[in-house]
Amino acid sequence: MKYDIDKNEYGFDTAISASDWKYSAAITGLLYYFKELEKKYEIKTLTIDEITDNFLLYNKEDITEESYLNFIEAFYPEDTLVHKKIETQLKYTKEFTPEIIKNINKNISSNTVLKNFFSELKFDGTNKKEILDVLNDNKHLIIEESYKSKLYTNYCQVDKKGNSKLFESAKKNSPCRVRGYYFDPGRKSKATAYNFTSTSVDYFDDEVFDFIPFAFTGNSFETIFLNDNLNLEILESMNFKLREYFSEEKKREISNIMTLKQEKAMKEGKNEPIEETSVSVSLKKIFLNILKKKTDYIKYGMEIIYKNKERDYFETWYLRNDSIE
């Protein structure tokens, strides 16, 4: 849950606890955000409304639309935000060969968002500044639309017209923006709740849920989040390390697969290069490899939240204590 607190007493005006997995994920995303943008925060045990819990303390003023978009650009790699790849190609390529020009134009037209800005403009090898100016002048809009269509929509509601609650303050009794929790409180029935108890569903909305996407680790099709709502420092450490280990293990697996494919191609008399983009590794395989090698960073069994891009809901896995001993 999130609370307004006295800034004069605590040095911050907002406190948030990991009351369920949505708030745990939001806290993890907020921690990435605060660290990247060097904003002040504190993790502290407090008693609020007669509830003693571990809280993340921060100031509302440190969360702005502009900072959020800047964070998105810093957080995600070039293969996720293609405009970053285009900028890198234009800024650091010394000689624009026909093949490179073709590749840049391919990236420029790689998604609907970029097509809207470059419908009448193509790169010809001489108009680098013009392309970069378009990207720079429309950067935040490009980031926002790319993020909503490729990433945010996997975790929060975005309709066919691109409308969402991104950047919107939560209103009283407004439906939750998180996928699978989008119930109308005014019409909420027992059928929406576990064991037919209407109070068992936490359907309230909160603007901090906009930070949920950053908490998940994986690939473009499936992601996971390790939920520890007992200790925020352990929650932070586990998910930060998961992100690091996942990247390392993914690179290792892809390299192994590419080597095997290349060896097979050579045996068959083919001399075609194997592109990294043509190789995929399942999330479960990578995660199991991490558990075998890096169990030291997981302290005890816990809830794992899983999201498949093709499904409109989240799934829950459980990691038992005896499975990591």
What are the residue ranges of the model-derived segments?
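Alpha-helical structural elements
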Residues: 16, 176-178, 312
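Hydrophobic, Leu/Ile/Phe/Ala-enriched alpha-helical segments that form helix-helix packing faces
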Residues: 34, 146, 242, 246, ...
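Alpha-helix boundary/N-cap detector
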Residues: 63, 95, 105, 109, ...
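Proline-rich intrinsically disordered, low-complexity coils
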Residues: 77, 98, 175, 213, ...
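Basic, glycine-/proline-tolerant helical and adjacent loop/strand elements
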Residues: 102-259
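Intrinsically disordered, low-complexity regulatory regions
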Residues: 252-325
